[in-house]
Amino acid sequence: MAISKILNMKDCGGHFHGKHLKRALDYVMNPDKTQDGRLVGAINCQVDTAFEQMKETKRNFGKIDKRQGYHIILSFKENEVNPDTAFEITQKFVEEYLGKSYEAVLVVHDNTAHVHSHIVFNSVSFVDGKKYRYEKGDWAKYIQPITNRLCQEYGLSLIHISEPTRH
């Protein structure tokens, strides 16, 4: 079982655009939480230069302000998955959900009782400059269903998504 959630990172203003994005990348890539960096990967960018590449994409398309990026967390049930399997699941999630359009860093943290993954990705597509658009309901429509399907493929338990009650 893995529960997912998505957070956004806004621009902090001032002269250092992307401060929150940089902090998120630094936090998730902490060697103490990722087996000295063994559980760190990237898609459509290089791990060591991910922040610079993301900023360059924003510059190229004139979108350096406002929303800087997004942070998805996949939290697995305690003792249900090992870090390597969590990494495989996370990598497949990123490939399917973000495709070939967004620069993303993916990591697994194994420093707590439950293994969990972090995905930090650019808000601007390096392919066409379009900003990622998260709509209300996307979690239940796309994010958690992909997570559930991947967990099912690996024999993990699932989160059941209930339809909202209407009055």
Predicted feature descriptions by range:
Residues M1-S162:
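N-terminal nicking endonuclease/strand-transfer module with a His-rich metal-binding environment
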Residues E163-H167:
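Short "domain-exit" segments at the C-terminal end of structured domains
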